[in-house]
Design a protein with these regions (language model features):
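Conserved donor-binding/catalytic core segment of Leloir-type glycosyltransferases
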Residues: 1-16, 22-25, 42
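Nucleotide-activated donor-binding/catalytic signature segment of Leloir-type glycosyltransferases, i.e.
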Residues: 39, 44-48, 53-78, 82
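Short acidic alpha-helix that forms the nucleotide-activated donor recognition element
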Residues: 75-87, 108, 185
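Aromatic "clamp/platform" in nucleotide-sugar-dependent glycosyltransferases that forms part
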Residues: 95
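Short glycine/serine-rich donor-binding loops of glycosyltransferases
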Residues: 100-103, 121
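Short hydrophobic beta-strand element within catalytic cores of glycosyltransferases
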Residues: 112-115, 125, 132-138
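C-terminal amphipathic helix plus adjacent low-complexity
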Residues: 156-271
Length: 271
């Protein structure tokens, strides 16, 4: 019989740091007695083998001599809720993460979360400022764009935050920049152990506090509130939209196209 279940529900891709989750879980299990470790399970609802990630069963065979279970079936919403509720705690330590849907899902199901303090995952951590109010998107600027530096450490009881040990910026054409923040797997193991130590009624109470937080319409995590805000912003955009004036061409001069003259083997040209 298991008395501590850790749950992961996301893709097996590199930026999700799935291998680090397994290695952190192994490090945690190494730090407790064998008897206690045998009562722990890591459930991973993901594709065990993915070209965008790695071969997780092979990784477990070689690096994690503890109980790891893979869930590969596709479930409807109600069944996913049951799956979340088999867990005592969830874990999400992604890098390059815009939001991290799994984090909100776990909290809505009343399951506390071990989370990397980066990107949008910070939004559901419930960080508080000096005056006791919650940190919001309005507090972020181009000069200070993330709490990954630990400026505010007072957080909601429903999360076990892991502060990134490596902070950098990545990007692409559609996403010019995003935080590539990665935690040390040993720091993750420490937070797993803290959650394990709280297992039972204390951990359940933390999860229920998180559920209460994300269901509060003021913070905008539930779908109905997201839709309401989206509709409001679109209406506001349309109301304030001012089309550009038409450009009239009158007696435009004729443009003569000329072939470029290439300058030898250089990459410059003259027109």
């Amino acid at each position: 019989e298991k008395d501590f279940v850790l749950f992961y529900n996301a893709r097996n891709i590199r930026r999700k740091l799935v291998s680090d989750i397994i290695y952190a879980y192994r490090t945690f299990c190494d730090s407790i007695s064998k008897e206690d470790a045998n009562k722990c399970t890591l459930i991973m609802h993901t594709t065990p083998r993915d070209d965008n990630g790695t071969n997780l069963p092979e990784l477990v065979t070689n690096l994690c001599p503890y109980d790891v279970v893979f869930s590969t079936s596709r479930f409807e919403r109600d069944a996913m809720n049951y799956l979340y509720n088999t867990a005592d705690c969830a874990i999400l330590i992604s890098s390059n993460e815009g939001f991290g849907l799994m984090g909100t899902e776990s909290l809505i199901c009343g399951v506390p979360l071990i989370v990397n303090v980066s990107g949008g995952m910070q939004d559901y951590c419930g960080f508080k400022k000096e005056d006791g109010s919650y940190l919001t998107h309005e507090d972020y600027t181009t000069r200070w764009g993330s709490n990954h530096d630990g400026r505010y450490k007072d957080h909601g009881e429903w999360v076990y935050p892991v502060w990134p040990s490596s902070r950098s910026i990545q990007g692409s054409i559609p996403t010019p920049y995003i935080s590539d923040d990665r935690p040390d797997f040993q720091d993750v193991a420490i937070q797993i152990k803290k959650a394990w130590a709280d297992r039972g009624e204390k951990l359940k109470a933390r999860g229920l506090a998180g559920r209460k937080y994300v269901l509060n319409p003021e913070y905008g995590f539930v779908a109905s509130e997201m839709c309401k805000r989206f509709t409001h912003d679109i209406d506001q955009t349309l109301d304030k939209f001012k089309p550009r004036p038409r450009i009239m061409l009158d007696e435009a001069s004729c443009w003569e196209h000329s072939q470029p003259e290439w300058n030898g083997l250089t990459l410059t040209k003259e027109i």
